[in-house]
Amino acid sequence: MKKIIFALCLLGTITSCCKQPTMIGHRGSLLGVENTEEAFINGAKHFGYQGLECDVKTTLDGQCVCWHDNNLQRGGHENSIIAETTLDSLQSLTLTQTRKDVTYTATICTVDRYLEICKEYKVFPVVELKWATGINNNDMSLFPSLYALIEKHGLVEEAVILTSMRQSLEYIRTNYPQLQCQYLRQTVKDEDVQWCHDWKANISIQHANINPDLVNTCNELGVEVAAWTVNNDSTYQRLVDCGCAFVTTDYLEIK
């Protein structure tokens, strides 16, 4: 009997050590055209994710919109280049995308509206910076306008800036130290982890390249690990066991 009680206590200790990660909706969620209002609202309202991730591009007239690519091919408009098109013209287009056999339509979502949704549903924004005019390793001249939007919605303390552009993160950490930062990586080298420690950033890694030793190394340096993009339960549980702090997903239910 004593052995059974001890085993149960040990199991409880192990379980309590595996803290459930914070869940982030990838480009909002599966339910809707990615990176649009419907997907963001469903990520917060339907799935209950604590954070919503978006990708940022800039328009011809310097406005920040939520989209992953340089063009709108994913939404059915291959010839529409975001950097060469005004916001008004982009918003006149109907985006269409089929996901899991369901076809959705939408219009492009501004970062302003995305942040409004985050505020309304009490979730934190994860703003991924893609290479764009005025927001890239060589030129961050449009970042102040993006920061102004974050400030406008009272989300400075909650917002996470995510990007693979190291120089951009160094600019943000130097000029906007109040913002949280994550360094986006496919695979990770020791120097990446050390850089995150030195620049007070966390790290976001493709899930297949995460293991317990890597997470422990990061945590020992005060660096939290986020995993992307996780869409099955077995992978999710493996990452929980590894000790990941954040998991980005399209449609996993919160455990």
What is each model feature region?
Residues 17-255:
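Phosphate-group recognition and catalysis centered on beta-loop-alpha active-site segments
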Residues 1-21:
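Bacterial Sec-dependent N-terminal signal peptides
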